[in-house]
Amino acid sequence: MSDAKKLLETFEGSSAAHGTTVVGRVGRNGKAESDSRVVRGVLTEEKIQEHIEGKMGVGSIPINQDNMCKFGALDIDTYDLDLKALNSKVHQLKLPLIMCRSKSGGAHLYLFTKDWEPAALIREYLTEMSVALGYSGCEIFPKQDKILADRGDVGNFINMPYFGGDITTRYALDTKGESMTLAQFHKAVSKAKVSASDLDSLTFGGERSHFTDGPYCLEVISSQGAVTEYRNIF
């Protein structure tokens, strides 16, 4: 199976639309200027091949017309971000996330599931993970629990990694914080996929003890002595 086909399966989402991005110069704030737009029509293997070849960047919309997802992501849009430190925390908390460097140096933390799951459920778990990681204000994809497909809503896309293939700045990080090749990324995704029951069993690197009626991430925050700040989030 080609790399493009594997990425298409990994980032399977909306069949109604996808995203394209043309990257320009990097501004003084460290953020790359870009022209991004939603394009009606299915994301194809051919378009992803162009992405891998560095010709045209593409993005996938996680939520489909039935409000289901097979992947989601946290978008931590901080350009002085210590990627290795954050990646280390992901593994410390035993979160089923794969970190990829974004086009401007931030982090996309991807969650991949074995089957289609309700978008609302994916967003719920990603919200817990964002709080546990200390980034409760970050963007979450999908951005909606539900879309009105009959009115033409399609959702929001997130740029895919490995623009330019292995010669890229949008690479995934392994457990040691080193960049992965595209082939290594494919293998990592296959190992990282989870079911809804797997998500329900997450312990965030510890054992459940208190807050038994609430999100487990509150236990993590409490153990760090910072529960008051977050008590009204959920």
Stretches found by the model and what they are:
Residues 75-82:
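Short, surface-exposed ligand-recognition loops at beta-strand->loop->(often short) alpha-helix junctions
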